[in-house]
């Protein structure tokens, strides 16, 4: 193991490893239940703002823009704890979720399970109740 790898894996210096697009993957879970709420991406600015403010900030690949969770919907995330994985290319935030995490109005983005069916797969809705109407909130 190189000295650099050892420092990344065992050291106390936070040195996030951004991908070629300048992003790290972020997994957000509910601090109270442990449920996975969403998977998103952070650039350096989103990561710094999240650490500084205690609010979740992300980078939207589709909009190519920084955004604070809840800035439009009011469905915010207060960060209780942030962790990084062994090689510092992903972060996990444990949050107090206010309302829904998903832009579809659901508590979690993981509201469908994949089930085997006739050699293929199908989706089945689970925990899919909407907490808000996305058309009303986002004025689509």
UniProtKB/Swiss-Prot annotation:
Cofactor: Mg(2+); Zn(2+)
Co-factor binding details: Binds 1 Mg(2+) ion per subunit.
Residues binding Zn(2+), per UniProt: 86, 102, 109
Organism, as annotated: Bradyrhizobium diazoefficiens (strain JCM 10833 / BCRC 13528 / IAM 13628 / NBRC 14792 / USDA 110)
A molecular-function term among this protein's GO annotations: magnesium ion binding
GO terms of biological process kind: L-histidine biosynthetic process
Lineage: Bacteria, Pseudomonadati, Pseudomonadota, Alphaproteobacteria, Hyphomicrobiales
Protein name: Phosphoribosyl-AMP cyclohydrolase
Subunit structure: Homodimer.
Stored InterPro entries: PRA-CH, PRib_AMP_CycHydrolase_dom, PRib_AMP_CycHydrolase_sf
Family: Belongs to the PRA-CH family.
């Amino acid at each position: 193991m190189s000295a650099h790898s050892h420092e990344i894996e065992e050291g106390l210096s936070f040195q996030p490893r951004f991908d070629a697009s300048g992003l790290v993957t972020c997994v957000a879970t509910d601090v109270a239940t442990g449920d996975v709420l969403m998977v998103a991406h952070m650039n350096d600015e989103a990561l710094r703002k999240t650490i500084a403010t205690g609010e979740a900030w992300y980078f939207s690949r589709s909009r190519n823009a920084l955004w604070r969770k809840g800035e439009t919907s009011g469905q915010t995330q207060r960060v209780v704890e942030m962790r990084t994985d062994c090689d510092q290319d992903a972060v996990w935030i444990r949050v107090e979720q206010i309302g829904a995490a998903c832009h579809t109005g659901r508590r979690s983005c993981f509201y469908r399970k994949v089930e085997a069916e006739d050699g293929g797969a199908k989706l089945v809705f689970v925990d899919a109740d909407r907490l808000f109407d996305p058309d009303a909130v986002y004025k689509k």
